[in-house]
Amino acid sequence: MFRVKICGVTTPDDARLAAEAGADAIGLNFVPGSVRCLNMEAARSVAAAVPAGVLKVGVFAGADQAEIRRIATAVGLDAIQLHGHLEGVAGLVDPPATCAALADMQLIRAVRLEADGLAAARRWLAAAEAAGARPALVIVDASTPRNAPGSALGGTGAKVDWAALAREAPLGIPIVLAGGLDPDNVAEAIRITGVIGVDTASGVESAPGRKDPHKVRAFITAAHHALDTQTA
């Protein structure tokens, strides 16, 4: 679906910057409480600046499927990323049933590498598949506390343990790495983990929600080079 995604884009200029630098996908954040969360007017403006051929990915946590569909249609999203907690009874949780209800859409599931590895992710994916749904991609992000608010679900700069991820058995779904990636470490992260793609937000920012042109270009160049080398 994509190899390099720049997430948490909040302005049309940053969307154009990422696309021109070679990003395959742009992430638009709709998670309540996030500093990068977009209202509908801003989301439409950002989406309109994304050229054809670059995926517009909507990032959600805890939203019901009707709300996700409404926003996807209004903004013109190409794919949906469920970024909420895997388990829990309250808060920003995205249960397998949400994935099943959106099975006709391009779906991405963000999971977190915990102390027990990807055990919770495997349970969630098995339940989703039993309900007739299967994400096209899994994004592995850094661990967050159970029932953490939207501000702590992503874009925090926290890193995944790359060596621990490399030891995990395959999920049967392509994995994209997120969590604390920046221009200086993305090539090493790809080399160690063997992932098929990478995703960053805070790692290419000058301030929360504002992308740094130099960092964006450097990150995308380094990521594409490392991914090309890996598959050569």
Tell me the role of every PLM-derived stretch.
Residues 1-5:
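Extreme N-terminal starter segment of soluble prokaryotic enzymes
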Residues 15, 43, 68-69, 125, ...:
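Generic hydrophobic/aromatic pocket-lining and core-packing "Φ" positions
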Residues 18, 80, 138, 161, ...:
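Conserved, mostly hydrophobic/aromatic
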Residues 20-22, 74-75, 133, 192-193:
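Structural motif
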Residues 23-35, 81-89, 142-148, 193-216:
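Glycine-rich phosphate-binding active-site loops on the catalytic face of alpha/beta enzymes
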Residues 30-34, 47-177:
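Conserved anion-binding
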Residues 41-42, 46-50, 93-102, 201-232:
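C-terminal helical cap(s) of enzyme catalytic domains, especially alpha/beta-barrels
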Residues 166-194, 205:
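A C-terminal functional module that forms or caps the active site or interfaces directly
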